[in-house]
């Protein structure tokens, strides 16, 4: 709610909350991945193409995903060219890890806002909480600051 209120106060029309909705009961993600999101902090995220290489799905240069750091990322970070040389074997290993719920190897896609996630509620509850907190904060801000026409 705080992030939504802040963004709206700065003139945004909305916010991106993908990680928050990934850690909900209805999301199709693996339960172990959701638990990692709850336990994570924003400084444990990295941005790059390592997991795109492992998934055989490399995006154009300006695009890269943010994921939670894990053993795979620590092993290959800064060695993307070498990973490309081993892509077939690492992709196979990655696929097995993802199927098995092994998130020491498979990616957990998560943004820096992961710090604010502490539970895995129903999605409707996330929306209700977010709207309630944003509404309260926005109402409080309008009461706190009076604009003078002078």
Positions of the model-derived regions?
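Conserved active-site-proximal phosphate/metal-binding subdomains
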Residues: 2-150
């Amino acid at each position: 709610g705080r992030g939504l209120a802040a963004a709206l106060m700065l003139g945004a029309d909305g916010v991106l909350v993908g990680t928050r909705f990934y850690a909900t009961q209805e999301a199709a993600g693996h339960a172990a991945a959701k638990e990692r999101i709850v336990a994570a902090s924003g400084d444990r995220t990295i941005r790059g193409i390592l997991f795109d290489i492992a998934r055989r799905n490399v995006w154009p240069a300006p695009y890269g995903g943010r994921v939670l750091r894990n053993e795979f990322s620590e092993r290959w970070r800064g060695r993307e060219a070498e990973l490309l040389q081993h892509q077939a074997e690492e992709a196979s290993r990655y696929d097995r890890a993802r199927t098995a719920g092994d998130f020491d190897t498979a990616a957990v896609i998560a943004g820096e806002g992961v710090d604010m996630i502490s539970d895995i509620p129903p999605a409707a509850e996330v929306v209700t909480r977010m709207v309630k907190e944003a509404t309260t904060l926005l109402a409080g801000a309008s009461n706190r600051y009076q604009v003078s026409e002078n």
